[in-house]
Amino acid sequence: MFLLYEYDIFWAFLIISSVIPILAFLISGLLSPIRKGPEKLSSYESGIEPMGDAWLQFRIRYYMFALVFVVFDVETVFLYPWAMSFDVLGVSVFIEALIFVLILIVGLVYAWRKGALEWS
């Protein structure tokens, strides 16, 4: 029989982990001083007055490099635990990791062919 009372701890942690950040934002919003002045409204650039406009438009090339970096950085995060427990896991996990790496290599080749890795 399916018993819902076994999930009481889960619901308690869910409620507590939701309430704590909300309370932190509310309390900091209530206790923080609200003063608007020219220093508060100016943009900050290494402790000196900004040179030029603070809003610069970046080329899409930067975003493409960042996106490719994030994809392969996440790949490393997923492959590290697998590499640390490689001797304990079986052949099926090795095949799954191999398929995962092959899918990422296909994505890298696709990005390379589309010119996402060229800086010109």
UniProtKB/Swiss-Prot annotation:
Alphabetical GO biological process terms:
photosynthesis, light reaction
Q: Which GO terms describe its cellular component?
A: chloroplast thylakoid membrane; NADH dehydrogenase complex
Spell out the Pfam families in the cross-references.
Answer: Oxidored_q4
> Where found?
Plastid, Chloroplast thylakoid membrane
EC number(s) stated in the UniProt entry for this protein:
7.1.1.-
User: Where would one find the signal peptide in this protein?
Assistant: none
Q: Which UniProt keywords apply?
A: Chloroplast, Membrane, NAD, NADP, Plastid, Plastoquinone, Quinone, Thylakoid, Translocase, Transmembrane, Transmembrane helix, Transport
Similarity comment text for this entry:
Belongs to the complex I subunit 3 family.
- Summarize the subunit comment: NDH is composed of at least 16 different subunits, 5 of which are encoded in the nucleus.
The name under which this protein is listed is NAD(P)H-quinone oxidoreductase subunit 3, chloroplastic
UniProt source species: Populus trichocarpa
Q: Recall the taxonomic lineage recorded for the source organism.
A: Eukaryota, Viridiplantae, Streptophyta, Embryophyta, Tracheophyta
